[in-house]
Regions:
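Residue(s) in the substrate-gating loop at a strand-loop-helix junction
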Residues: 151
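A short, exposed helix-loop element centered on a Lys and neighboring polar residues
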Residues: 131-132, 176
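Canonical Rossmann dinucleotide-binding motif of NAD(H)/NADP(H)-dependent dehydrogenases/reductases
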Residues: 3-35
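The beta1-alpha1 cofactor-binding region of Rossmann-like NAD(H)/NADP(H)-dependent oxidoreductases
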Residues: 49-53, 70-81, 113
């Protein structure tokens, strides 16, 4: 059985929706939880402590232990104070779930760059700020579990969400690097791509889907990702009780000798370039570099 006894978790954006569900479930399984929520509107404006305090009250009433925090996830000083408060009260931080986010949807033609920057700031920079605030502590204790929250908009695209999609794929790149940097300290970093009915998605989902897409149907996946036996560097997709893994593959591709390196030859052989047979999954950028060097060396030997 997966439990979190004596562990300390921070969940951002935990006043509503997915974050609330994650925080309550962690507490039910023994974790001491920092319920972080700025308490702003869906577009990130305003602030209130009411939502975070409400979730803490729910956890307390069920016999759990939690504290509310209203730090803006983009403010390093405020986030550092949040982490310090958790360590002062409970002695450590074992788990960070980066869940906070905002939406400012418009087609790119109509999108103000200020709205682009605001969304990227919360989702991508906010994830980096919160992770930075716990990173040294997790390295020192040789243990940590971190989840970043991505989205189908980042993995596959969604009309009207250029800002959100850019940020959400950005956190996957962030995860891909930290999974390597944290491995020797037993810090495991994974991504969750949820499909759920929350206030963020309320206007995007038909009514008949909302009942199936409760946040609670996603939370079992994130609890696995922050458990002691968690994987490292995976993207777990989840919604309506379904769970899958999204992965990035690169095709085997082709090598062109110098005299054939023209755009016309790339076009002529593009289907061969895209052929998925023999595709592979890399765990670091250096593996891609070595692949092309091997192809070049083999190609030159064949020419000789």
């Amino acid at each position: 059985m997966i439990t979190f006894d004596e562990q300390v978790a921070i969940v951002t954006g935990a006043g509503h929706g997915l974050g609330r569900s994650h925080a309550i479930a962690l507490a039910e399984r023994g974790a001491r939880v920092v319920v972080n929520d700025l308490g702003g509107a869906r577009d990130g404006t305003g602030s209130s402590s009411e939502a975070a305090e409400g979730v803490v009250a729910e956890i307390d009433a069920a016999g759990g232990e939690a504290m509310a925090n209203g730090a803006d996830v983009t403010d390093l000083e405020a986030v550092t104070s949040m982490v310090d408060a958790a360590i002062e009260r409970w002695g450590r931080v074992d788990i960070l779930i980066n869940n906070a986010g905002i939406l400012r949807d418009k087609s790119f033609a109509r999108m103000d760059l200020a709205d682009f920057a605001a969304v990227v700031n919360v989702h991508l920079r906010g994830t980096a700020v919160c992770t930075k605030a716990v990173w040294d502590q997790m390295r020192e204790q040789n243990y940590g579990r971190i989840v970043v929250t991505t989205s189908s908009s980042g993995l596959y695209g969604n009309f009207g969400q250029a800002n959100y999609g850019a940020a959400k794929l950005g956190v996957v790149g962030f995860m891909n690097t930290l999974r390597s940097e944290g491995a020797k300290y037993d810090i495991r970093v994974n991504a969750l791509s949820p499909v759920a009915h929350t206030r963020m998605t309320d206007e995007l989902l038909p009514d008949e889907a909302k009942e199936l897409l409760k946040p609670e149907e996603v939370t079992p996946g994130v609890l696995f990702l922050v458990s002691k036996d968690a994987p490292n560097g995976v993207v777990l997709t989840a919604g309506a009780g379904g769970f899958a893994s999204a992965r990035i593959y690169e095709t085997e591709g082709i090598w062109l000798p110098p005299e054939e390196r023209t755009p016309e030859n790339v076009a002529a052989r593009f289907e061969e370039i895209r052929d998925p047979e023999g595709q592979e999954e890399f765990t670091g950028g250096g593996e891609q570099s070595m692949k092309f060097l091997r192809m070049a060396m083999a190609g030159m030997q064949d020419e000789n």
